[in-house]
């Protein structure tokens, strides 16, 4: 690590009332894990005094942050059981297990999909702008399982990232929910980080500067009593989008207690699986469609409830 750099900011009127950890995270673009370490080390001061992360900032206050620049390096992890769904000269589609992060949030961290990619495919470290991302073109929540795409070259990574930004990637999820739910529908509700709960998002008030567009489409595949197995296609890629959108229409995901979902102690996770990805290959331009099999614990939960697990290839949905 290099010597710390002092960053100072004055709280503007439109940021008054925001938690100081969210304020710092927004202006410096830091992960929650790194913010936690900064506050534990007393590296964040408000008007010269060490601040706790829950402090609400006021207009005109001076916020100072001592920040060490972290070394960005890819750490190979050969012990991670990487499952490759598809491999070619440009792309890798891998099956992420629940409980594993997509990529590291701090220097030296291992145990993530990105670490496993770099161990098996070293060229992935140079494909993404940040070598710690191991060529990954997107990410999934820690407790979400399913298909991820990574690039083996910078050109492929740039092309696939652009496709995500242009909504040219077909992203399908399977979720088990409870609550009344129409057979199908669209959810077009912008989201933002919750101002007092940094580990979740919420519907953004109209006109909010930090609002991010979020559009999802759902279709019920099976029902059993109050349970519904739903396929969700997302057209944007906001943090926790599927979880927050389904909870927002009164159908939270089973096991997702952060968003009001019913507890599922026997499951050990929430029921959300990235079922399929479809995109145009960056080199051949041919359409690709890669699916991830439903994990055994999710299949067992469906069987317990008398629901049928769907086939691996989802039916096409209109882009609308």
Predicted regions: what is each one?
Residues 1-320:
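RNA pseudouridine synthases
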